[in-house]
Amino acid sequence: RVGIMGWSHGGMITLMNLFDHPKDYVCGFAGVPVSDVIARLGYKGPEYMALFSAPYHIGKTPEEDVAEYRRRSPAWQAAKLQTPLLIHTNTNDADVNSLEVEHLIQALKAEGKSFEYKIFDNHPGGHSFDRMDMPQASAIRLDIYRFLAKYLKPPKPFKNVKELRKAAYEPWKLTGH
């Protein structure tokens, strides 16, 4: 029982792992995932473009190798989804534009894929909205946990935010040392 989750570029890594290795994961969560590298280059500026076109990365611009940029963009790989997936995005995210994630969502729908998603509308916190130490973010994390638990079937699932927060903040207890 292995699930995978990540946010931002980690969300992109989550998606690409689910698409390329579907039998390795029971489920996945992608939070504010980088979803379309080509679209992203259009709004992130020349520094971001320089990272991708550098010889140690892709080594070419999208104009020189659009196929490679599509291969590395989850929105262009949507047909590969076989694993239960939850996606979150936020319309006021200044890092990963929600239109990029909406492209992924529309691509998954066009492929007839079964998945869950939520587009948060101007939720406080922008890019980090569900990772902040606030009651609203804790409630969102509990929803993410419940989605994952549905497939991972933990022996003692959390019943509420209080239990989730207790586990998150409980000091590690070393035994046998």
Go through each PLM region and give its residues:
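Active-site-proximal cap/loop segments of hydrolase catalytic domains
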Residues: R1-H177
